[in-house]
Amino acid sequence: MGDKQERGLEFFSKVLGEDNAAGMREHIGSSDFGKECGNWAIDFAFGTVWTREGLDRKMRSCAVLGMLIALRQTDEIKYHVRIALANGLTVQEIEEVLYLSVPYAGFPAANSAKAAMIEVLREVEGEAAG
């Protein structure tokens, strides 16, 4: 395993939890269909881009959420809301990212994102309650 992959898995574990990281380790070490997509995500997205200097993790989360809203990638938004919370964003800050997207990405994209965000925030609230 290379340095980028190690950094990527370490970051992945910090923001999505050790159970998810263990699942990703298993997937990228397997012969499963699409495993290279997982390798690329860990090596490039998490091991190279997310771990760069220049922006803190909160700023990166804001930027990624904004892009995902504009692209209407609601499944990815769900992951990245959890990542944003792990990176220190508050629910109010995530809500402001949503509001900022409206004049640039439009109401339909923002409304789709809002539904995905609410779903995840309710899950997180339920997990915290026990």
Sequence positions of predicted segments:
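A generic structural micro-environment signature
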Residues: 22, 55-56, 61, 77, ...
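Substrate/cofactor-recognition hotspot
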Residues: 107, 111
